[in-house]
């Protein structure tokens, strides 16, 4: 990390955290009354702009995934008098101090991981009955000796202390992923589960985890967790914690949630007291292990939730480092909405003779309960189109709408615009402080602020019931992100609506989008269909695609960011 010498040093490079350069960290010399904030341009961050269009360079940006900070700019935007050295390489260096584990399983204590006892009613079902049930519920399985699915909660054979909590929730029957996933996970085998967001997969691994914990020896002082759940975002990690807290209450199972963006103190105290379950994002967990605050020697049940999203976000090196700290005979459950080659490779490397359950086709497809409306517009029409849709949607005061933008800057700009126009909108993205993100999510969940603006980083971690509409102000980089975005609505058997503004800038994605719409039997705008003739073949997974950047640095002062603190305009619209 270098501060840039000479005539106008650059700001500190990006990379101290996920894709965020520091805001105005090293401001150059006395010219700097307006030096732009340093990086924080998301996944593919460029350096912050310099004073007067380039005098005195801005902070260095991240590389393609925002992990390696670029050098600070020099006088005259980088050439000139002594540009800064290379920026921090924090994320890629994470785990460099982890001790290599040499596992001699013959000297390690044995542990129980097979708990499934097939109910006589399930055992009596013929293969024909089982095949019919799987076909009705779009369940496909792969692998040898896969247990039959269960059709009721009682058939799953959970102990009474688990069943009490399940029945208290009032669920009518297991979801398809639970029907097949519970017997698989309870059998102690490594499992891959592919299912859409909102399919009930969290409970599919939570309940077997509770059974697993209760069969293990009690934690001794200094022991790390027995169950480790890795998740891509803070919001998803908190959601998982809520489920584990709810269903582990009667067993007095302790848990903690370990993620960045908040002070470490409370997390360190939880780990020191001892927790049976740790839900974590990869970066903060490695930090805790490297600093000796916890260890993974006791982990015998590992969950990788939303594995595809973690890889999309560039966490693969960190995941591999973490998995190297866990005994290889553990039970591993990997859950994903999609099954691309990168996820397949990870499963092949770290899961042992796994069995697999897929809900629906392995071809990426949208939830058919969601009505998809795609409008071809010009860039300057977007705000007007959005306002017109909002006026119609918010005629029903119970509606909730989640608006997606491509960058943090646009998210903040749109939020200010809507608030000044009288709409109760709030925004959430990676540059917001954790307490602000929590507050925004709560305002949205409770309906106090029924309009939330978000970037893709937040898209997977947001679990809010009864989102009636998703609005894509900016189209994402690829059709996978599109499907994940619109999957925020139409959950748990409900219907939903997704409205997307599509411009000529998105033309390369037209063919992929039309394929998604066609598969879901949606109406296709003729102008969109016309684009497919000229637009090329689409962008695939887009690992090195256009950065989500553009947002300003976090900036000091105040409890909440300026966009969320913008006053509502006089003509309240809701």
UniProtKB/Swiss-Prot annotation:
At which positions is ATP bound?
Answer: 195-202
Copy the domain comment.
Answer: The Q motif is unique to and characteristic of the DEAD box family of RNA helicases and controls ATP binding and hydrolysis.
Question: InterPro entries from the entry?
Answer: DEAD/DEAH_box_helicase_dom, Helicase_ATP-bd, Helicase_C-like, P-loop_NTPase, RNA-helicase_DEAD-box_CS, RNA_helicase_DEAD_Q_motif
> What GO molecular-function term can you cite, just one?
RNA helicase activity
Can you list the GO cellular component terms from the UniProt entry? cytoplasm; nucleus
Q: Which GO terms describe its biological process?
A: nuclear-transcribed mRNA catabolic process, nonsense-mediated decay; rRNA processing
Organism expressing this protein natively: Botryotinia fuckeliana (strain B05.10)
Question: Superkingdom of this entry's organism?
Answer: Eukaryota
- In chain numbering, where does the motif Q motif fall? 151-179
Subcellular localization, per the record?
Answer: Cytoplasm; Nucleus
Q: Tell me where the transmembrane regions lie.
A: none
Name of protein: ATP-dependent RNA helicase dbp2
EC number of the protein: 3.6.4.13
* Catalytic reaction list: ATP + H2O = ADP + phosphate + H(+)
State the span of motif (DEAD box).
Answer: 305-308
**Which top-level enzyme class is recorded in the Swiss-Prot or TrEMBL entry?**
hydrolase
- Tell me which residues make up the Helicase C-terminal domain: 385-532
